Amino acid sequence: MSKDHKDKKRKHSDEATEEVEKKTKVSKKEKKDKKEKKEKKDKKEKKDKSEKKDKSEKKEKKEKKESEDVPTKSSAVVSTGYSQSPALTKLPQSEIDSFLQENEVTVEDPHNLGLRPLLGFDQIDLDSRIASVISKFPTPTPIQAVSWPYLLSGKDVIGVAETGSGKTFAFGVPAINNILTHDKKGLKVLCISPTRELALQIYDNLVDLTANTPLKCVAVYGGVSKHEQVSSLRNASVVVATPGRLIDLLNDGALSLDSIEYLVLDEADRMLEKGFEQDIKSVMQQTNHANRQTLMFTATWPKEVRELASTFMNSPVKVSIGDRNELSANKRITQIVEVIEPYDKEKKLLSLLRKYQSGSNKDDKVLIFALYKKEATRIENLLVRNSFKVSAVHGDLSQQQRTSALGAFKAGKTTLLLATDVAARGLDIPNVKVVINLTFPLTVEDYVHRIGRTGRAGQTGIAHTLFTEHEKHLSGALMNVLRGANQPVPDELLKFGGHTKKKAHSAYGAFFKDVDMTKTAKKIKFD
């Protein structure tokens, strides 16, 4: 073989080897690239998975925190099975419309259930033990007629109505019926009330309602032994409580609200006025909101009450009885306003008592309102000296004395009850014929609540008010209430010629300004 041929062959061999090495290098590089690419992909997927997990955990934490921050809103409660009776369904719509119009009923129903009001007790199917108690009444009151179908359907309800409208049975009947028909054990109903007197009154009504049942009702409030109340809570199905004592018992571990299914706030506006908002929220947080049906009753509908309702109620049905846009008095009450000199009030009071408690009316119940405790004590002594049998309810008396005084008045042992505004809201004292305002209250709202102690449960009543120049800044607002109830405005009151405007100052707070309504308003022209 020639040398040239050998060199040529070696060259081809070297080229082939080089080509193989080159291909091997490319193959290795491709494998390396693929490996790096795969590692990058795995790393990215791992990172995405980690980020997704973190987001999920953050979302869960956020949802958990939100759930803990707002534990007060009640969840939708399973319906107790209310169905409209055939008798109610057959009623012509004109009859329903007439009832709603006559009683000035407004219903705001976010569920659009369109449930008809109950015009008779025969239109509702209740446990026989409850039906036997309420059958002694002629018909349901407007607040009962409208709210019962919604409450029996498991809905949260807000009732805006005047005091004395039958609110205790409005929530009591559906609540007790629910316990009886489902044979529920343990503490199921909690009603929170602003004052001891109102709590005891609600308790008495619920005891009457459950008289034929094995259910136990308990009232807890301040001013008496806590130890005795703790003992009485054993095996209770229904508890009526004032906010302060309720918080005490919860803090002591003497009471658990885990099993509460029916929570009632009575006189919600009054409780906010008395500064119980934080106590109420604290109570809400200790209930099982998933199983809770919440009811709120209030005489007025201010911003603070609306905010409270939006916090812990679940799409509530709002039932309003009467014109709630303006402060209004019960039209069944004859209002008499007499303008006198301040020094004539005591003499005038004695004259009025002889007038309203004479002849066949000598045993009529008369409720007298004083403004301050010292005034109440002085007037009580005046009446005793003039041979009047009188009971008194004011802040200087012990709880036992106040309870005894109310009991004597309710039973007719005394026909005069002297009170400060502690008794002006919510107290249901049957058959009060006359309310006398010896001293006008600090606000016209309190005036309306005071006179609402008479004319209850469909009856008529008289409210006689002694008005002096010291209260002239309230004359305009008082005249509005009188006109709204179709009551005469005395000429002496018109002479004050004022309309009250409420003002507010960041440092001073709320105050009132007298405006002379006899002057022509200044006309402002815009170019």
Swiss-Prot record:
ATP binds at A161, E162, T163, G164, S165, G166, K167, T168. SMART domains: DEXDc, HELICc. Residues 148-319 form the Helicase ATP-binding domain. It is found in: Nucleus, Nucleolus. Residues 72-89 have a biased composition (Polar residues). This is ATP-dependent RNA helicase DBP3. Residues 1-89 are annotated as: Disordered. A motif (Q motif) lies at residues 119-145. A motif (DEAD box) lies at residues 266-269. GO terms for cellular component: nucleolus; preribosome, large subunit precursor. Keywords: ATP-binding, Helicase, Hydrolase, Nucleotide-binding, Nucleus, Ribosome biogenesis, RNA-binding, rRNA processing. The Q motif is unique to and characteristic of the DEAD box family of RNA helicases and controls ATP binding and hydrolysis. Transmembrane segments: none annotated. Residues 12-24, 45-71 have a biased composition (Basic and acidic residues). It catalyses: ATP + H2O = ADP + phosphate + H(+). It comes from Debaryomyces hansenii (strain ATCC 36239 / CBS 767 / BCRC 21394 / JCM 1990 / NBRC 0083 / IGC 2968). SUPFAM superfamilies: P-loop containing nucleoside triphosphate hydrolases. It holds the Pfam family DEAD. One of its GO terms (biological process) is endonucleolytic cleavage in ITS1 upstream of 5.8S rRNA from tricistronic rRNA transcript (SSU-rRNA, 5.8S rRNA, LSU-rRNA).
